Amino acid sequence: MQFQRDVPSLWLWRSLSLLLLLGLGFSQTPSYRDAVLRAVDDFNQQSLDTNLYRLLDLDPEPQGDEDPDTPKSVRFRVKETVCGKAERQLPEQCAFKEQGVVKQCMGAVTLNPAADSFDISCNEPGAQPFRFKKISRLAGLLRKGGEKIGEKLKKIGQKIKNFFQKLVPQPE
């Protein structure tokens, strides 16, 4: 009889221990959203705008590597709030500004707060980020270079054709 009473309490004790351990494990693993919120805070600190920006929406977390030190690609939008930077208020406590600026952000974050690695660029929709402008300029240069090489090859081909035509005897 004593054994039967101890089994449920043993089961309860193990279940509570397991839940406690799982809770500790989850509380130490930072979330994707938390990493993005840290990136938004970093954006607010670096931004030259006078008002704070707040997370508007966030694309779902990409599946893959579970290592919190591995950078994860992110894509989200922020919107200007009514709070000025000088007020030193948390963006989450600020209302969105009517007709506030919305910026599309993309880049990479690490989930580990100790590493706190962000590579984020935010721009208004329709505006190209600086690094994309560099790539488009490079593409233009490559296209022009390819056209010049094509023209040179065409001239070389014509010279070769002319050379062989001169070797063929002409009928008199």
From Swiss-Prot:
SUPFAM superfamilies: Cystatin/monellin
Tissues expressing the protein: Expressed in granulocytes (at protein level). High expression in bone marrow and small intestine. Expressed in testis, spleen, stomach, and intestine. Very low expression found in heart, lung and skeletal muscle. No expression in brain, kidney or liver.
Ranges for region Cathelin-like domain (CLD): 28-134
Superkingdom of the source species: Eukaryota
Record keywords, A-Z: Antibiotic, Antimicrobial, Disulfide bond, Immunity, Innate immunity, Secreted, Signal
Pfam families, per database record: CAP18_C, Cathelicidins
Biological process, per Gene Ontology: amyloid fibril formation; antibacterial humoral response; antimicrobial humoral immune response mediated by antimicrobial peptide; cellular response to interleukin-1; cellular response to interleukin-6; cellular response to lipopolysaccharide; cellular response to peptidoglycan; cellular response to tumor necrosis factor
Span of the signal peptide: 1-27
Localization annotation: Secreted; Vesicle
PTM entry text: Proteolytically cleaved by cathepsin CTSG.
Entry GO CC: cell projection; extracellular space; specific granule
Propeptide stretches in the record: 28-134
Annotated disulfide bonds: 83-94, 105-122
Keyword flag Disulfide bond: yes
Matches recorded under InterPro entries: Cathelicidin-like (IPR001894), Cathelicidin_CS (IPR018216), Cathlecidin_C (IPR022746), Cystatin_sf (IPR046350)
Entry's family note: Belongs to the cathelicidin family.
PANTHER family: CATHELICIDIN (PTHR10206), CATHELICIDIN ANTIMICROBIAL PEPTIDE (PTHR10206:SF2)
Function per UniProt: Antimicrobial protein that is an integral component of the innate immune system. Binds to bacterial lipopolysaccharides (LPS).
Protein name: Cathelicidin antimicrobial peptide
